Amino acid sequence: MDVILLQRIKNLGKLGDKVSVKAGYGRNFLIPQGKAVAATEANTAAFEARRAELEKQEAEVLAAAQARAEQLNEVNIVITAKAGDEGKLFGSIGTRDIADSLTNAGLTVDRAEVRLPNGALRHTGEFNIAIQLHHDVVAEVLVTIVSE
């Protein structure tokens, strides 16, 4: 099944690409979610008429993400947690804890945007945490974990 993508989809394509996908993926996920339309002649013509509008929306989302990234790059947060003598935490600091700390600092960050590639943080110290705001925009936040 051929579809025209209405937004960037990881491992598939970007806005305006005409791609071939399995029929079930197109019918049951992409089209109902509004991420793609079937690549008929009528839809192709309608998409070309809306292309500028969709690209403008995409540019606005990117600009907003870049503005948020500039704010986040300047932020350092301190999280206190119970820890043993050697700096090992009783428990761990995960994406929710980091997102909540950033929200308490006055920034809106969803826990799904926080990237912890090595899993939850289990030791005291300073960590550079990546915040994926957009597929092209990643902010770095310095998180310091101190013992209570």
From Swiss-Prot:
Keywords: Ribonucleoprotein, Ribosomal protein, RNA-binding, rRNA-binding
Family as reported in the entry's similarity comment: Belongs to the bacterial ribosomal protein bL9 family.
The encoding gene: rplI
SUPFAM superfamilies, per the entry: L9 N-domain-like, Ribosomal protein L9 C-domain
Coiled coil spans: none
Organism the protein comes from: Acinetobacter baumannii (strain SDF)
GO CC terms of this entry: ribonucleoprotein complex; ribosome
PROSITE patterns recorded: RIBOSOMAL_L9 (PS00651)
Domain of life, source organism: Bacteria
Biological role stated in the UniProt entry: Binds to the 23S rRNA.
GO biological process: translation
InterPro entries assigned to the protein according to its UniProt record, in alphabetical order: Ribosomal_bL9, Ribosomal_bL9/RNase_H1_N, Ribosomal_bL9_bac/chp, Ribosomal_bL9_C, Ribosomal_bL9_C_sf, Ribosomal_bL9_N, Ribosomal_bL9_N_sf
GO molecular function: rRNA binding; structural constituent of ribosome
UniProt cross-references to Pfam families, sorted A to Z: Ribosomal_L9_C, Ribosomal_L9_N
Record's protein name: Large ribosomal subunit protein bL9
